[in-house]
């Protein structure tokens, strides 16, 4: 799952997958803006056929946050 998430993030952020790890901060390290985050969440929701509640989206700061959320909901 981690590798799939990193691949999605790399595509949205337009960076090499190798530059992303669990501790990578989506905003500080990858310079993602709000529209990028919406795109990222949408792609993850489509891939895993689930809806991430807004309150959970606001908590997501790192790749690890996404992986942890999905691990407990997929």
What are these regions (language model features)?
Residues 38:
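Conserved catalytic core of two-component sensor histidine kinases
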Residues 1-18, 71-73:
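Thiotemplate assembly-line natural product biosynthesis machinery
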Residues 13-31, 48-59:
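Phosphopantetheine carrier-protein modules
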Residues 25, 35, 62-65:
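Residue-level recognition of oxygen-bearing side chains
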